[in-house]
Amino acid sequence: MSQGFNHFDENGNAVMVDVSGKNVTYRTAVATGEIHVGEAIMEAVKEGSVKKGDVLGVARVAGIMGVKRTSELIPMCHPLPIQKCSVDYELDETNGIIRAFCTVKTEGKTGVEMEALTGVQVTLLTIYDTVSYTHLRAHETLS
């Protein structure tokens, strides 16, 4: 039944992939996403006048926390020692877009792509949560 899907055994049961025979290597993943907040929210974020506080600072911490919790959220994701995690931003003020970049590094037998994707998504969700009361037109895009 596996037919190339390595998260299922021959009987179709979900399994965690066996990485025990793989070599330990350096792993890096970068995920990016964006949230369209518009000019008014962008200005409030830059000025620090959002009622809920430091939007980007809180979202950065939330993203890092999301990275550390990835294996608890994604069923077949291996728990990994995270050796570096950062969340950075690019503000496109003209178009009212906040871009988030989550970089994750480890030394292990499997990659950290899911951790980077989870981190950027939690970052964007936190931004949405902190500004949505102001303007419900904010929406996000993940890539």
Set out the residue ranges of the language-model regions.
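Acidic-glycine-rich active-site phosphate/pyrophosphate-binding loop
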Residues: 29-44, 89-105
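Single conserved hydrophobic/aromatic residue that forms the stacking wall/gate
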Residues: 135-143
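A glycine- and small/hydrophobic-rich beta-loop-beta segment
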Residues: 17, 21, 25-27, 37, ...
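C-terminal active-site-capping segments
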Residues: 129
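Compact, glycine-rich, soluble single-domain proteins
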Residues: 47-88, 105-107, 112-125
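Short, surface-exposed charged micro-motifs
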Residues: 4-5, 86-90
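Generic secondary-structure signature for well-ordered alpha-helical cores
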Residues: 13, 71-75, 103, 132, ...
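N-terminal presequence-like segments and the immediate start of the first folded domain
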Residues: 1-27
